[in-house]
């Protein structure tokens, strides 16, 4: 039996990631979003390269990639102090790897990736910074969210004040997660991250952030933090995203063990 595993969001240190559902829609605000990553690299001094990896459903007739992607800058008191934009860089189609003989891979699974990057200089700040990007929507077919057609995403990274003195960079994940699993079959996959500075990373299941709505699909500027988590549907939670199925993550290694039972599209968060 076919099962779609969809990792909706990951918050790890100052790193945020989201992989959302592959769903078709006829409305521009709807489920073209498949997900995204956001992280930064310190280039020296107060200069940073900001990277956002945005994923969308190739076959969706919803909105395309944003031609201009807005990023809002807040200080540590959650007050907006700046904003910058990144033009659309073009996209590539990702390979969907699936070699389980339980089912033939459906032909309607296709993911595009666009990597938005910009180099910015930020002045020293005693409170640090939060950079945010928000977009809606995930799509009506996500199984474990209360109102997925009105749930968007927030990509957020925090640059602490200590980063300016030591030129710190944020963590980022090394593997694109699987999009397709088979129900009733256990699978393990490596969902670990790397930190360029060698900082210790600890993993746990958590609730993804929402962001935007069907009324305001692309907030510009983004709303200030703190951000609200998604609203789970009945019988689901951050630590029980599969309902009757099982999902665990090793807090040290980042290895995920999944045993889905009911077919569907599932939101799963890792912090």
Q: Could you describe each region identified by the protein language model?
A:
Residues 1-34:
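Bacterial Sec-dependent N-terminal signal peptides
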Residues 29-271:
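Long, compositionally biased, intrinsically disordered segments
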């Amino acid at each position: 039996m076919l099962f779609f595993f969809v990792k909706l969001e990951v918050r790890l240190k100052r790193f945020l990631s989201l992989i959302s559902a592959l769903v078709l829609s006829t409305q521009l605000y709807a489920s073209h979003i498949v997900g995204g990553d956001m992280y930064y690299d310190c280039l020296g001094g107060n200069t940073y390269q900001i990277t956002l990896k945005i994923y969308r459903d190739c076959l969706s007739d919803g909105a395309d990639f944003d031609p201009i992607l807005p990023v809002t800058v807040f200080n540590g008191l959650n007050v907006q102090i700046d904003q910058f934009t990144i033009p659309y860089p073009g996209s590539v189609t990702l390979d969907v790897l699936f070699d389980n003989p339980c089912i033939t891979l459906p032909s309607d699974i296709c993911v595009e990736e666009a990597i938005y990057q910009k180099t910015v200089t930020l002045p020293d700040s005693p409170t640090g910074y939060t950079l945010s990007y928000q977009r809606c929507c995930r799509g009506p077919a996500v199984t474990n969210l209360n109102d997925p057609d009105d749930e968007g995403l927030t990509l957020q990274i925090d640059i602490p004040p200590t980063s300016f003195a030591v030129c710190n960079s944020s963590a980022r994940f090394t593997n694109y997660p699987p999009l397709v699993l088979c129900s009733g079959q256990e699978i393990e996959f490596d969902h670990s991250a790397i930190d360029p500075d060698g900082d210790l990373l600890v993993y746990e299941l958590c609730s993804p952030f929402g962001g935007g709505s069907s009324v305001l699909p692309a907030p510009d500027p983004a709303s200030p933090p703190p951000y609200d988590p998604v609203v789970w549907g009945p019988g689901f939670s951050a630590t029980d995203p599969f309902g009757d199925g099982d999902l665990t993550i090793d807090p040290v290694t980042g290895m995920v063990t999944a045993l889905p039972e009911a077919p569907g599209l599932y939101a799963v968060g890792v912090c």
